Amino acid sequence: MKVLQINMTDMFSTGNIMLNIAKKARERGHEAYTASKKTRMSMCQNRKDPYHSYIGTRTEHTIHRYFSWMTDLQDFGSVIATYELIHKIKKIEPDIIHLHDIVGWYVNIGILFNFLKIYNKPVLWTFHDCWAFTGRCIYFDSVKCDRWKTGCGKCPQIGYMPKSWYFDLSAFNWKRRKKLFTSIENLTIISPSKWLKELSDESFLSKYKCVVINNGINLEAFKPTRGGIYDELKKLNKKIVLGVASTWSKRKGLEDFIKL
């Protein structure tokens, strides 16, 4: 089986998830390809992987990003990059296309999803945030907004990534995404948590099956141990709350941890 995964990055959390899935798929005898946006850190890493390809150029990404910031017409850029990606898809002829994060100013979702509709092969889409069913936001819980259920508009997070400098076209973007994303017949959504699944089930994507597959953990590295710091912590005879984040913010509960 041939599988192609597409993600915003080949690094960090979602990038590593994509690459680890590809690695496991190859170990089981499948042809696993990956594609991602080429970032500055990707260039420094200089990945030499015959199964990986980069989408677009740094110049295209920059133009796309500034166009989005100035107009709030998200994901209308990267036309050439998206057609080049489609050419690669046709060349690989994958049996399954697995999407991850497609926000990030590197693909034109209109061109991509119109192609996926015609290509008519199974599409998996792993949600790593809420962007797919909103008009802009990747998260909305910190501002307690539920406009994503009815069509967005009057966005309270216009300055939050992916931001807009001047306009609020979140209602237009919401309608456009609904039309594009619900046009795919054979689509299965994957959520890493029950919480995100429940949100997806309340959105315009509720007609699609959403399966919870938790992010994997390397049990060789993360496992119960005795001795060392365990013994020191046990001596304290206190309840310990552990939280981990790549970068802490109010939305990720930093203030709650401080209160605890």
Q: Which residues make up each language-model segment?
A:
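N-terminal subdomain of nucleotide-sugar transferases
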Residues: 1-47, 92, 118-122, 185, ...
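A conserved catalytic-core segment of Leloir-type glycosyltransferases
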Residues: 26-96
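Conserved donor-binding/catalytic core segment of Leloir-type glycosyltransferases
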Residues: 190, 232-252, 258
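Carbohydrate-associated surface elements
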Residues: 195, 216
